């Protein structure tokens, strides 16, 4: 194939070269040379812009020339050129010097580079003839065009390939699927190099392609997606009108058959067997059925219906959208004792139908489902789902207010026993007879305390105590008139001396805890013993309130400052209840505006010249002076006193223990009381004497005195910790040398080691002479005779 293509390419090249030579010959023949005669007339005509006589026109050159020699394009010649070599030809413009060159003497133009028409179809150049000796232009500069002749060197290309398309299955023949398009970079205006025709290389006999437009169509009927849903079609585009020697390109078209609803649903089973407990809850799943459909997507969507066997509408069936399964659920409670089995006829059909495929139907199918109800031991069931009881609050204890009844729904019909859920009756107001179900009161009821009771009565099977049923019972306690009305606010009432007759001085009100059906109404009146009270009267407002009014004017605080008015209130219940109360009325002195000034029998009055504002100012000044005095006393009390050591102040009454053995009578070193002020300084720098016996001096240790017990406790713990953690502490008694020990003491040293280190006889008889305080010590260190006598 490549050899044939090369052969045709060379033939076309030779043909175009011959055509080019003929064209140039015609151009040279049609433009005769005009030779310069050399006379003045010729020069004068030359200076008067004579018609230029360039022998040239547009040139043509073939693209893709691959020869070893430069490609001859054409020849430029001026009629002023006498062939003596006096004229120089110069070339400029597009590609001059790089793509094209010119012979300066002959004017021959050659192409020195391979030309590609698809990159550039023509070049515009400029030519000029110069006098070789003077370089003066012999002719004005002129333009000429070099056109690149096209050859068929580009195959068609599918720029948008590969393609993906879809077509519904079962489409009629000739259904358009997709249009493909190929482009050829060759010159469409010259020859047939760019004339493309389409053909199908792979995909017959299912598809066809239009040779001119590239439209792909179906070529077979009844293409079934369920049999094959994918096709790979290869399309060829060939130039030169599809003739032999043309170049070709291919592309791939992936065609997918989309689904249509052309398959009816079918149940793989014609009979299903299911079982379910009668205790299954409503909306619970009984089982699943599935009608298979070879279609997909919306064409496979199913809807299910129960068309027979469920006259009581106990079951329901819905479609699971995730897998198109029919889910059978319980719509009403099941009862083994009522019906033990069901046989349902279920239909499955497509949700979406296509009219043009109805002849392939029917698009529905049926199956039967047999459901067996299994018996379950059920708890007792009450005759009513709830009970509502009304009872008066004055009912006697043990009164039956309701009888409940429950029975075992199973075939065994076991006997039941009744009880009350005590969590619903924490006050234990009621109890129920275990056998009869009679609900009775167990303690007095009080509507004002609890007006509603919500209890739960339980029924339990005797043979199976785990089976317990319950029913709610709501008890409303009805009111009886057992509470007398009481005053809501009953306090002392103040009135002015200058009160007028029939003046309102107090509004009284009362409440009643009872709740009569006809509404609450409280009546007010004066007590019978005060019905003819000359000072005050009562007016019932008929709205559960009453006004206390003055009957006369002229009250005097000095004559009588306090009045007591007994009141009577009663309700409208049956029986009618009443209560009494006494209103205390205090007579006060008031100013002209009615503001109370004093309610005492002998009120304190200010001088006429002293106003209330002046009194407030005086009291404020007194208060400020008191604050200043207290502040000064407080500052003087907390003022820091100078640090002085007084003989009386140094008496702390503390017992000071020394850790040094006494110097006896010779211990005349003065005791520094300052150590008591800071006992820690005396202890700082203390070293262990048993670890360094050669120490020259021993610091005197003063015990720390603490005011609080917790400080003493902390100090003791610190010393104990120091002793416990000291790994160098000797577990033995060692001889210590103290510089404070006196030589002239009568008692000398009490060191046990020093005593044992001497050979002298040790006698402690002198301890008895020291008095009663050393009696115990004398007994411990007595003579041998004494020890023997003990």
UniProtKB/Swiss-Prot annotation:
Keywords: Calcium, Cell adhesion, Cell membrane, Cleavage on pair of basic residues, Glycoprotein, Membrane, Metal-binding, Repeat, Signal, Transmembrane, Transmembrane helix. Residues 634-790 are cytoplasmic. Residues 1-25 form the signal peptide. It is a single-pass type I membrane protein. PROSITE patterns: CADHERIN_1, CADHERIN_2. Residues 54-158, 159-267, 268-382, 383-487, 487-605 form the Cadherin domain. InterPro entries: Cadherin, Cadherin-like_dom, Cadherin-like_sf, Cadherin_CS, Cadherin_Y-type_LIR, Catenin-bd_sf. It is found in: Cell membrane. Glycans are attached at residues 254, 283, 413, 454, 535. GO terms for biological process: adherens junction organization; calcium-dependent cell-cell adhesion via plasma membrane cell adhesion molecules; cell migration; cell morphogenesis; cell-cell adhesion mediated by cadherin; cell-cell junction assembly; homophilic cell adhesion via plasma membrane adhesion molecules. Cadherins are calcium-dependent cell adhesion proteins. They preferentially interact with themselves in a homophilic manner in connecting cells; cadherins may thus contribute to the sorting of heterogeneous cell types. Three calcium ions are usually bound at the interface of each cadherin domain and rigidify the connections, imparting a strong curvature to the full-length ectodomain. This is Cadherin-20. It comes from Xenopus laevis (African clawed frog). The gene is cdh20.
